[in-house]
Amino acid sequence: MNRSSIRNFAIIAHIDHGKSTLADRLIESCDALAERDMKEQVLDSMDIERERGITIKAQTVRLKYTSKAGEVYYLNLVDTPGHVDFSYEVSRSLAACEGSLLVIDSSQGVEAQTLANVYKAIENNHEIITVLNKVDLVSADPEKVKSQVETIIGLDASDALLVSAKTGIGINDVLEAIIERLPAPEGDEEAPLKAVLVDSWYDPYLGIVILVRIKDGVLKKGMKICMMSTGAVYTVDNVGVFTPHKKMVDALSVGEIGFITAGIKELLACKVGDTVTEDARRCAEALPGFRATCPVVFCSLFPVDAGSFEHLREALGKLQLNDASFTFDIESSTALGYGFRCGFLGMLHLEVVQERLEREFDLDLTATAPSVVYKVTDKRNVTRDIHNPNDLPEAHEILKVEEPWIMATIMVPDQYLGSMLALCNGKRGERVDLSYTGNMALLQYRLPLAEIVFDFYDRLKSISKGYASFDWQMDGYMPAEVSKLTFLINSELVDALACIIHKSKIESRGREICERLKDLIPRQQYKIAIQAAVGSKIVARETISPYRKDVTAKVYGRDVTRKMKLLEKQKKGKKRLRSIGNITVPQSAFIQALQVKD
């Protein structure tokens, strides 16, 4: 295939600005699917994506387009996620393309994730086409949004395209702009094969499938390929592209994006960002690959049925193949048995992974409270990362603790600014900058990551009636005054409930969690004490009163000694029950107890 007829582009936008709908219209305009196969969010293959109305996995499709001049072009479209938790998917997709369609809702304007994604595209030296979507809405104001694009982002918006992905207005203009304004891929077809591994996933019929972008050379069926990071050699069984259905081809050449299968059995053999080359004629050096992302939120997942442990391990391995930003390690808990300590890029990422495990692999799971990574330096001046609250050393062994901070960018209508400032200040935030564009305020705040993990995003949306948008980047570590808050049920330590809390919130958080546990744990025939402790100091306590059988009901008259005898016997029985009885804490109680609202 002549590379001058190829265009590789990604669609980037803030969440809910119409990326997937625009992708649907482009597919429809190029007749890539029969009318009976067209449906909304055609590239969103997971049920979770359709239900939540979001894109989680970046998807590719090759479109064949005949221009107004009568020339045939092959367009490789990548529909990317919009949520901040899936920014790694976006960066990987952008590395495989030469240009981007920046989609902006013409009624909402530029939002926080719009900024984050466009900066990623600029880092990848992309040619950017600005597309103002939803121009058919009564509330649309394209001129105002053009002004925002120029003042906030710094892009020339004079040639921005006005589009309605829902009704199809302006779709042909987008297709023409792609072939006229985006560059063709560069590369040498005669050079040794050099391809970057963009994604991988497990297919029940084909085994491990890898998605590649060809930088140099040609990748053919039957060729022996080598993974440059491991040196492993495989023979290519199948070569294909998505149209959006799988379509087998004989070869992929410079600039093309497609998939291959090569009988790969080892999950760890497919490292995203790895360079694929021909074994017989290897390229001189590997491609730079992608900048690895580190998980920032950690949570433990335990199977409700202990016999499902191996099934969970296998499921996590298959998910990690498809999501390189997700990590997991084995851990054990006295309360919950064996499970895995998992790392995620954010709370939505955590929710999606847990939901996928439960749906796709039919697992019943218990999740503990999410926590962030603390850097702890002990008295011997040794620093280590603490992912699990139970690994935090005793207070007398610690020299200092540092917690992760983020730089948050918040865009909010000015009428909600006061409430937004109060929210950020209440989360121990430090204001960095405040500027205005029309009636929108652009806030920059430094915040501790631990403060935004649970409910910050929900409260931000609630305060602003849904109009505020939020994006964040890691911004280093700062000294922190934190302690480990532990919980005891009838004097037994429950390790699954331990959490690391800022010292200013220990008592209030301990009290709230104890109250929540009191409501969640079923009553027994004896009294249950729920205590929150820091070290040996009890900071909060709640008591679940027992069921009481009226043992004196059968005693007639005024036989006080008989009544006292029966009550004493009941007391001894309850004491014996309490000493041998195990409290059964419902699985749902662990996560519900720790999701405390401020």
From Swiss-Prot:
User: GO cellular component terms?
Assistant: plasma membrane
SMART domains in the record: EFG_C
**Keyword Oxidoreductase tagged:** no
| Span of domain tr-type G | 4-186
Q: Which UniProt keywords apply?
A: Cell inner membrane, Cell membrane, GTP-binding, Hydrolase, Membrane, Nucleotide-binding, Protein biosynthesis
Tell me a Gene Ontology molecular-function term this record carries.
ribosome binding
The record's subcellular location field reads: Cell inner membrane
Described purpose of this protein according to its UniProt entry: Required for accurate and efficient protein synthesis under certain stress conditions. May act as a fidelity factor of the translation reaction, by catalyzing a one-codon backward translocation of tRNAs on improperly translocated ribosomes. Back-translocation proceeds from a post-translocation (POST) complex to a pre-translocation (PRE) complex, thus giving elongation factor G a second chance to translocate the tRNAs correctly. Binds to ribosomes in a GTP-dependent manner.
What is the protein name stated in its UniProt record?
Elongation factor 4
> Organism source for this protein?
Anaplasma phagocytophilum (strain HZ)
